């Protein structure tokens, strides 16, 4: 039976869609929210059995040949069709064919710079663009919105169509690709309703541990200890080296990372809590993360799952899409999981110079106007130590890892 869940939109409660007879295909359980449970590997097999070799091929499609004779008659038919669709005259359709024809699609010469706008251009769009660029240059305007758009575009398109140098790293035809959204840790209330922190593409044949290793979280880089008496002492470990335990939760199963001897079963406390109080969640199962691929999973598209690491750093994980690989995708399997989107984070600046990113945070600091207070490395040492490196005053100092460093 489908759960009696309530929709989050203005249309009121969502009603479950009647179930079909199989679970190998993603069908909606609640409209516009999430699908029913289906098996990822069976979904891929179903489509590979339906599609032909040409549909699954990853080779570039051949360009259609241009007709060598009868071109005039074909142009006449095309002009008539365009005139009918656009509601214009045959003369206007013929002019459009001449101006917008394929022979007009030419590349720039080797000595021409595409970034330079010519002075004698007649295009209004280029004139407007040139005026904006000249205005920014004169007024030293920083277009942060444009910078973020460029960052997002480059992140999404940097690997499109990329092929591996080693043919052995080529993705197989018919491989499944899943889109995975990684949200901010639950403890960050200000990002509770925000867009995903990271969006990744993973292959169906990849193990869960490969996604686990590719997720970047600032809590993995934290450095434990207080360093006010020895700021030059290099930290021995970061949190990711000390606390290697983690798990994914998908459809009643906790997939624990047990690759290292020091890994613990973080799900045991949750399972014991559920069973001892008869919470009504049913019987949970556990498995080793390194033994399962995404093709082995039963999932719902659009349903919130869980990734937990560092003991209590919890990220909501949503699988938003599943499809077969296309020849325009990145075909180098060594680049997967492939990061395609990332939220831009503002860095925390030093309280003193307001220029550089904070590297230290202090508590109970007699030299600071607030508690806690953030400093870059230069300002921290100039304010808290003498020329010989001796500590001045009383304070507690901790290394600070700014989330903006992931930009």
Curated annotation (Swiss-Prot):
GO terms for molecular function: DNA binding. The modification Phosphoserine is found at residue 42. It is found in: Nucleus. Residues 1-25, 58-78 are annotated as: Disordered. Part of the SNAPc complex composed of 5 subunits: SNAPC1, SNAPC2, SNAPC3, SNAPC4 and SNAPC5. SNAPC3 interacts with SNAPC1. Part of the SNAPc complex required for the transcription of both RNA polymerase II and III small-nuclear RNA genes. Binds to the proximal sequence element (PSE), a non-TATA-box basal promoter element common to these 2 types of genes. Recruits TBP and BRF2 to the U6 snRNA TATA box. This is snRNA-activating protein complex subunit 3. It comes from Mus musculus. The gene is Snapc3.
């Amino acid at each position: 039976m489908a759960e009696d869940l309530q929709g989050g939109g203005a249309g009121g409660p969502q009603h479950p869609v009647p179930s079909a007879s199989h679970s190998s295909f993603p069908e909606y359980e609640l409209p516009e929210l999430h699908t029913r449970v289906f098996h990822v590997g069976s979904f891929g097999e179903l489509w590979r059995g339906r599609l032909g070799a040409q549909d699954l091929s990853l080779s570039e499609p051949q360009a259609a040949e241009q007709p060598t004779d009868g071109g005039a008659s074909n142009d006449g038919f095309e002009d008539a069709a365009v005139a009918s669709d656009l509601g214009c005259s045959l003369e206007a359709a013929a002019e459009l064919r001449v101006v917008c024809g394929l022979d007009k699609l030419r590349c720039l010469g080797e000595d021409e710079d595409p970034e330079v706008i010519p002075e004698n251009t007649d295009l209004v769009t280029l004139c407007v663009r040139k005026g904006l660029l000249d205005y920014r240059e004169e007024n030293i305007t920083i277009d942060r919105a444009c910078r973020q758009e460029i960052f997002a575009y480059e992140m999404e398109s940097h690997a499109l169509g990329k092929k591996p140098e080693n043919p052995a790293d080529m993705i197989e035809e018919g491989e499944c690709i899943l889109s995975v959204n990684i949200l901010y840790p639950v403890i960050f209330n200000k990002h509770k309703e925000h867009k995903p922190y990271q969006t990744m593409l993973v292959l169906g044949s990849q193990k869960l541990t490969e996604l686990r290793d590719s997720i970047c979280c600032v809590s993995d880089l934290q450095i434990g200890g207080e360093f006010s008496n020895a700021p030059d002492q290099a930290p021995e470990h970061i949190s990711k080296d000390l606390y290697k335990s983690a798990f994914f939760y998908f459809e009643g199963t906790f997939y624990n990372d047990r690759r290292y001897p020091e890994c613990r079963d973080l799900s045991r406390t949750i399972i014991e809590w559920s069973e001892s109080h008869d919470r009504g969640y049913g019987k949970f199962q556990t498995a080793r993360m390194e033994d399962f691929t995404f093709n082995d999973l039963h999932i719902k598209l659009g349903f919130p799952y869980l990734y937990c690491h560092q003991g209590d750093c919890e990220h909501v994980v949503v699988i938003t899409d599943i499809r077969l690989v296309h020849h325009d995708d990145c075909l180098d399997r060594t680049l997967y999981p492939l990061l395609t989107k990332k939220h831009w984070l503002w860095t925390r600046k030093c309280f003193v110079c307001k220029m550089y990113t904070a590297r230290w945070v202090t508590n109970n600091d007699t030299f600071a106007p607030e508690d806690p207070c953030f400093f870059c490395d230069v300002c921290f040492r100039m304010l808290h130590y003498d020329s010989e490196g001796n500590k001045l005053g009383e304070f507690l100092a901790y290394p600070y890892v700014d989330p903006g460093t992931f930009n």
